[in-house]
């Protein structure tokens, strides 16, 4: 009995004493698994998101917005391969885990290079080029680059030209896209006509029912009137604004009908601005006041660059509003008055006149092409046939280099006896238009497009103008693969002379 008690006491004593083995004692934690971070960047060093990274075949992951992805280091040399949409794949060999535990893989983009030209092969600048989400603009030499390109359709558009496209299969190499000139068949809506609901509706119906595919709307006319509530403060300050329409409404009507939208801005005949700021006007050497035409209109001095500010501001606003093309009228030196008394700030000899006008239009083209608008210049028809600038600064060869469209005003009624061998040129509308174009077109190198104004009104010698006379002019123009614009001061046109719409 005593032995039993002793044994039990020893047992209890042992159970109450310290343990001989502590759980986990002497077991070290497993070392952390090393990781390698891969940063995928483009040729500029910027991170590429959504790039696929292959870690030697044992792991694949996509980069985040920071271009980074991490995976376990396999404790052996590994080939890291990276690829991304619009880039050439690339790889690097990693022999040992770097101290920074980071490597960088640079991908070179897939680049499509090309050139935009007209049908004759002349470069076309400021064309919008797109391939999926990748966009670019053609440069002055017509060249463009599409970076990060994927196979698909290359689309090219440019105001004054028809859009074009081609399928690109992903093969690198230069491509050429040739644009055909847009064949415009247009009428003109004066400010009052555009602002009259019935007259505007009639012009839209005319376009819907006939071959008309464009409309010219006056922004500023020969009297200097601006026909909408412009944000160009100068127009309000000089009292030139007479609100007739909302351009947003007119443009919406044109876009709804897929009609090409042109606005006409009279550049240098402006009595409002010349009266308010006589220092911008042509001077009169005899009277010491601004020079005036026989009809009392003041003319701005084209050699004074300050006189350019106002018409260019209106042009930029018109382009921003959504017009496709900005057409400058009266973009010349003055006529129809005592021009021998006209004085200018800058050179006004033949060379000086040409430099002033071409410089103004070049400035307009520089500003407006970059905004997506074409630039057109109206010119006297006489400059197509006669050499020199005819005192106007409209040297046709020089103008062709600085505008997208040249619109000679070929009105048979404005030709005097003897022109083209006719006693009354007005009685030979088709022949007059054809002869004038044949004289001038060889002198107008591309990519400038020739698009004449032609006559839809009765004036001068001969009979009245109607279906036959208007159609003969249209036919003469179209035989030369050109578009045209009908002029009528009241915006009332001879519908019977027009072909039905498609």
Q: What are these regions, as identified by a protein language model?
A:
Residues 32-49, 114-126:
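Structural motif
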Residues 79-94, 155-166:
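A short, solvent-exposed loop/turn motif at the edges and junctions
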Residues 16-35, 98-111:
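Beta-strand-rich domain onsets/edges
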Residues 47-70, 123-125, 133-147:
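Short, acidic Ser/Thr/Gly-rich low-complexity loop/linker segments typical of extracellular
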Residues 199-225, 320-325, 405, 480-484:
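Catalytic domains of carbohydrate-active enzymes, especially glycoside hydrolases
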Residues 403-417, 429-433, 439-502:
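Substrate-binding cleft of secreted/luminal carbohydrate-active enzymes
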Residues 262-270, 327-328, 353-392, 447-459:
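Aromatic-lined carbohydrate-recognition surfaces of secreted/lumenal glycan-active proteins
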Residues 182-195, 263, 268-317, 471:
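Active-site-adjacent "subsite" loops/lids of carbohydrate-active enzymes
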């Amino acid at each position: 009995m005593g032995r039993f008690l002793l044994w039990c006491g020893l047992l209890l004593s042992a159970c109450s004493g310290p343990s001989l083995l502590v759980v986990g004692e002497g077991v070290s934690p497993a070392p952390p698994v090393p990781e390698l971070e891969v940063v995928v960047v483009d040729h500029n060093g910027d991170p590429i998101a959504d790039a696929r990274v292959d870690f030697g075949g044992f792991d694949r992951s996509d980069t985040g917005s920071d271009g980074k992805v991490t995976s376990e280091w396999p404790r052996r040399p590994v080939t890291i391969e990276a690829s991304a949409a619009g880039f050439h794949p690339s790889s690097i060999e990693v022999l040992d885990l770097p101290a920074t535990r980071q490597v960088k893989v640079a991908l070179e983009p897939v680049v499509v290079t090309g050139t935009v030209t007209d049908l004759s092969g002349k470069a076309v600048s400021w064309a919008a080029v797109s391939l999926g989400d990748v966009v670019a603009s053609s440069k002055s030499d017509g060249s463009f680059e599409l970076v990060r390109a994927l196979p698909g359709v290359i689309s090219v558009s440019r105001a004054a030209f028809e859009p074009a496209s081609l399928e690109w299969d992903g093969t690198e190499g230069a491509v050429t896209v040739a644009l055909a000139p847009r064949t415009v068949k247009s009428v003109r809506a004066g400010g009052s006509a555009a602002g009259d609901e019935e007259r505007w509706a009639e012009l839209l119906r005319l376009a819907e029912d006939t071959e008309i595919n464009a409309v010219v709307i006056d922004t500023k006319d020969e009297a200097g009137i601006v026909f909408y509530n412009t944000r160009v403060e100068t127009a309000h300050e000089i009292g030139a604004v007479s609100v007739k329409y909302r351009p947003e409404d007119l443009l919406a009507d044109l876009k709804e009908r897929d009609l090409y939208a042109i606005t006409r801005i009279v550049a240098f005949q402006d009595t409002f601005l010349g009266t308010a700021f006589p220092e911008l006007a042509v001077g009169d050497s005899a009277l010491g006041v601004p020079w005036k035409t026989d009809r009392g209109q003041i003319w701005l001095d084209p050699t004074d660059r300050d006189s350019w500010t106002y018409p260019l501001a209106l042009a930029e606003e018109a382009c921003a509003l959504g017009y496709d093309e900005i057409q400058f009228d009266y973009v010349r030196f003055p006529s129809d008055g005592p021009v021998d008394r006209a004085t200018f700030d800058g050179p006004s000899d033949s060379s000086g006149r040409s430099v002033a006008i071409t410089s103004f239009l070049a400035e307009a083209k520089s500003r407006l092409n970059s905004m997506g608008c074409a630039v057109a210049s109206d010119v006297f028809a006489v400059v197509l046939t006669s050499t020199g600038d005819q005192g106007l600064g409209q040297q046709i060869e020089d103008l062709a280099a600085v505008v997208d469209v040249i619109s000679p005003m070929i009105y048979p009624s404005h030709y005097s006896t003897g022109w083209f061998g006719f006693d009354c040129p007005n009685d030979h509308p088709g022949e007059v238009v054809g002869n004038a174009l044949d004289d001038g077109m060889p002198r107008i190198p591309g990519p400038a497009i020739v698009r004449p104004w032609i006559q839809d009104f009765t004036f001068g010698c001969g009979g009245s103008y109607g279906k036959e006379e208007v159609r003969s002019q249209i036919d003469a123009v179209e035989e030369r693969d050109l578009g045209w614009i009908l002029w009528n001061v009241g915006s009332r046109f001879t519908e019977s002379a027009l072909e039905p719409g498609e």
